[in-house]
Amino acid sequence: MKLAYWMYAGPAHIGTLRVASSFRNVHAIMHAPLGDDYFNVMRSMLERERDFTPVTASIVDRHVLARGSQEKVVENITRKDKEERPDLIVLTPTCTSSILQEDLQNFVDRASIASNSDVILADVNHYRVNELQAADRTLEQVVRYYLDKARRQGTLSQSITEKPSVNIIGMFTLGFHNQHDCKELKRLLQDLGIQVNEVIPEGGSVENLRNLPKAWLNLVPYREVGLMTALYLEKEFGMPYVATTPMGIVGTAEFVRQIQSHINKWAPMFLGKLVDYEPYIDQQTRFISQAAWFSRSIDCQNLTGKKVVVFGDTTHAASMTKILAREMGIHVVCAGTYCKHDADWFKEQVQGYCDEILVTDDHTQVGDMIARIEPAAIFGSQMERHIGKRLDIPCGVISAPVHIQNFPLGYRPFLGYEGTNQIADLVYNSFTLGMEDHLLEMFGGHDTKEVITKSLSTDTDFTWDSESQLELTKIPGFVRAKIKRNTEKFARQNGVAKITVEVMYAAKEALNA
C-alpha cells in the first residue's frame, strides 16, 4: 500500500465494480468506508449513459466496527434484491473489509437464503491485485458461476451455431474507447460474414452466459480484461480464442488471418468450403483505410525519424509502439507500461521497435524519463498529457486512465480499419509542425510554464539578466528550451546564481568540450 496522488490502475474493488456495472441487471454492493464509494460519481461523470450506476455502498462506520458487519451487509443485499430485482448481486470486498477480517462468504450464504437473486462474493485479494487484474478475475468468476449453474440445470448450450460466430470478451465500462471499438469490431465481423454470439460484459445479460459455448471462437481485443475468461472457456469447452489486438494495418490483418485459420477448422463441415479473407484485407488496406496511403504521403514522411515516447496499458502501448515504428517510420525512444504483472509479454512485443523499455506504475519516473529524452511528442494516458503540458511537449492520448475528453460522443474507434484512420489523425495532429513553430515565434502563442530541469521538480533559484534574456530570444524556438536547460544545468554545477551572456557561452563551451 502506498500514498499517491495519481494511480494508473486503481484498487481491486474498482475493477470488480466496472465488470458488475457493465452487465445488464446486475447490482454490486461494496462493503467499504465513506470515500471508497467514488466509483458511482466517476462512472456517472465519465460514461455518458442515461442509467444510474448500479452500485450500493454498505458503509463501514463506527457501529459496524463495534457490532460487526453481518447484519448490515445481509440487510443491504436483501433490500436491494426486493427493490431492484437484479439477476445477480455481487458483494465486493475492499481493503477495509480485508483488514477487519470478516467472513463475507458467510454473509453471502446467509443472504442467498432470503434472496431471489443469485448472490456471489467477488473472489479478489485486495493486497495482491490491482483494478485490471481484479476485473479480469471477476469476469471469469461470473462466467464460471453461470456456466456451472447451467450445467447443473441441464440448460447449457452444447452445439455450435451453423454460421461462423464469435464472442467478444472484455468490452466494459470506463474502458478506453471500448464502445466505439465494439461497434467497429461488429462492423468488421459483419463484412466477413461472421455473427456476434455474445458481447460480455458490456450490455450483456448473465442469463445469456450459458450461450457462450455456441460460438466457434472467442475474441479478446484487450489483454487486460478477458484473457482469463478465454482461457477458462478453452480449457472447459475447447473453444479457441484470438488475443491479437486489431490496431493498425498490420495488426488488423493479422487479427483477420487468425480468425480465418480458426474458422477453416469447421468451415468444410458447416459451410462446405474454406473461407478466404485475403481479398477483404487487400481491399480494406488499399482502398478503404486511408492510413496506408497516408503513411506514404509527404506529410507523414516529414515525421520520419521524429523521437516519441509511448506509455500506457500493455495492449495500447505495445500496439501503438509497433504502429509508429513499423507503419509510420517514427523513432520510438522509449515504450513503457504500468501493467507490471504483464511486463514479460510487453517486453517481448516491443523488443526491436524501441530503444528503451520502462515498466513502472510511478508517474514521477515516467515524467523524469520524458524530461530526459525530450521527445517531439508523447503518446500516453491522461497523466502523460499533464506531463506534456508541464514540459511543453504535445501528447496524444492512447490509453486509459483518461478523463472526459476521451469519452467522446462522436464515433472514434481505435480498432479495425476505421481505427487506423483515427490513429493516423491522432499521430499527425500530435506533432507541432515546423511552420507552426515559426508562426508562434513570429506572432507569439499562449503563455507556457517552461520546465528547465531534467526532472519535474519546480525548485529553481536562477535569475537571468536582461542581456542574457535578449540573447536567448535570438535562438531558434525549437532548441531554445534545450539551451536554457543546459545553461542552468551548467550554472547549478558551478554554483552560479545569476546567468549572464558570459555564463551562456561558458556553458556552450563546456558542452562542446
Curated annotation (Swiss-Prot):
Its EC number is 1.3.7.7. Binds 1 [4Fe-4S] cluster per heterodimer. The cluster is bound at the heterodimer interface by residues from both subunits. Gene3D superfamilies: 1.20.89.20, Nitrogenase molybdenum iron protein domain, Proto-chlorophyllide reductase 57 kD subunit B. SUPFAM superfamilies: Helical backbone' metal receptor. It holds the Pfam family PCP_red. The keyword Nucleotide-binding applies. Keywords: 4Fe-4S, ATP-binding, Chlorophyll biosynthesis, Chloroplast, Iron, Iron-sulfur, Metal-binding, Nucleotide-binding, Oxidoreductase, Photosynthesis, Plastid. One of its GO terms (biological process) is photosynthesis, dark reaction. Pathway: Porphyrin-containing compound metabolism; chlorophyll biosynthesis (light-independent). GO terms for molecular function: 4 iron, 4 sulfur cluster binding; ATP binding; metal ion binding; oxidoreductase activity, acting on iron-sulfur proteins as donors; oxidoreductase activity, acting on the CH-CH group of donors, iron-sulfur protein as acceptor. GO terms for cellular component: chloroplast. Its main location: plastid. It catalyses: chlorophyllide a + oxidized 2[4Fe-4S]-[ferredoxin] + 2 ADP + 2 phosphate = protochlorophyllide a + reduced 2[4Fe-4S]-[ferredoxin] + 2 ATP + 2 H2O. The active site is at D299. Its cofactor is [4Fe-4S] cluster. [4Fe-4S] cluster binds at D36. Substrate binds at G434, M435. It is an enzyme of class 1 (oxidoreductase). It is found in: Plastid, Chloroplast. Protochlorophyllide reductase is composed of three subunits; ChlL, ChlN and ChlB. Forms a heterotetramer of two ChlB and two ChlN subunits. HAMAP family: ChlB_BchB. Belongs to the ChlB/BchB/BchZ family. Component of the dark-operative protochlorophyllide reductase (DPOR) that uses Mg-ATP and reduced ferredoxin to reduce ring D of protochlorophyllide (Pchlide) to form chlorophyllide a (Chlide). This reaction is light-independent. The NB-protein (ChlN-ChlB) is the catalytic component of the complex. This is Light-independent protochlorophyllide reductase subunit B.
